[in-house]
A protein has these predicted regions:
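Hard-cation-handling environments
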Residues: 1-86, 90
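A short linear-motif detector with a strong N-terminal bias
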Residues: 33-36, 104-108, 163, 207
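Substrate-recognition/cap regions that form aromatic- and gly/pro-loop-enriched pockets
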Residues: 43, 48, 65-136, 142-147
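Accessory, solvent-exposed terminal regions and/or long lumenal/extracellular loops of proteins
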Residues: 134-137, 142-231
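Sequence-level detector for tyrosine residue identity
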Residues: 10, 27, 39-40, 55, ...
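Short, flexible coil/linker segments at or flanking structured domains
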Residues: 27-31, 43-45, 114-116, 173, ...
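Hydrophobic transmembrane alpha-helix bundles
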Residues: 3-33, 114-127, 157, 162-165, ...
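Flexible coil/linker segments and helix-coil junctions enriched in charged and small residues
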Residues: 23-26, 99-110, 167, 181-186, ...
């Protein structure tokens, strides 16, 4: 819905700069105006997310915990180790700024995928209900695709580093055995080679793909560490 408002201002004009000699913009205080302009008092969502019943924050992320506490977020610590079925995000894509802002190289255009998995919860990890006054803050910071999320502000950057890799001369035999023992994996592998010429021409990309689709691939790489409990 668009409404109209009366906007008051001053006419702009281009005048020679006394510093550079080039043209510069100056608002003429002797030429006030009042104009009717469009006022866009609504918005169209470019993305949406279903609000979970709660989030789970592992206690290792103490900096995030401190910021949540400073903003009045209510949290409850788990009293014992347990296993919970939770929605887990995986970081699929993001961009990173080439220049710093407030001491951070911010991420943007973050995209995630979601799946239900059983996750290990340790005593002391934090359960954060969304049924509280700080719900807006929680959504803006704990949802990684949100513009000002903790992920986009680099608080979870350690998940972006793959710490375990393979040695090609060793993994060649392992990769062959994996394909022989997993027909579905082999079918997906052959289909990928058929559809992607650049993949077909790169032996390393092929071994890397097999590695990342095997039990040898570290599960925490690119896995967003804050879990969601669906309603």
């Amino acid at each position: 819905m668009i409404t109209k408002i009366q906007f008051k201002g001053y006419e702009g004009e281009m005048v020679p700069s006394e510093v550079t000699g080039a043209e510069r913009l100056r608002y003429n205080r002797e030429a006030p105006f009042t104009k009717e302009v469009d006022y866009y008092n609504n918005f169209v969502a470019t993305g949406k997310v279903e609000i979970p019943k709660a989030y789970i924050l592992p206690q290792a992320w103490w900096e995030v915990r401190e910021l949540l506490e400073l903003n009045g977020v209510e949290m409850t610590a788990f009293e014992k180790d347990t296993v919970i079925a939770a929605q887990v995000y995986r970081i699929e894509d993001f961009k990173t700024s080439s220049s710093a802002y407030e001491g951070h190289y911010l991420h943007s255009d973050t995209r995630v995928s979601a799946s239900m998995k059983k996750v290990i919860i340790r005593k002391g990890d934090l359960l954060i209900s969304t049924d509280q006054p700080a719900i807006r803050y929680l959504l803006e910071t704990l949802e990684p695709e949100a513009v000002d999320s903790f992920f986009n502000w680099n608080f979870f950057d350690s998940i972006l580093q793959q710490k375990e890799h393979f040695s090609p001369y060793v993994f060649e035999d392992v990769a062959l055995r994996l394909l022989e023992e997993n027909p579905d994996l082999e079918d997906a592998f052959e289909a990928r080679k058929d559809s992607l010429p650049e993949f077909r021409s790169s032996w390393y990309a092929q071994l890397d793909w097999i590695h990342k689709n095997s039990r040898h691939y570290e599960p925490t790489h690119m896995r967003y560490p804050v879990f969601r409990l669906p309603r």
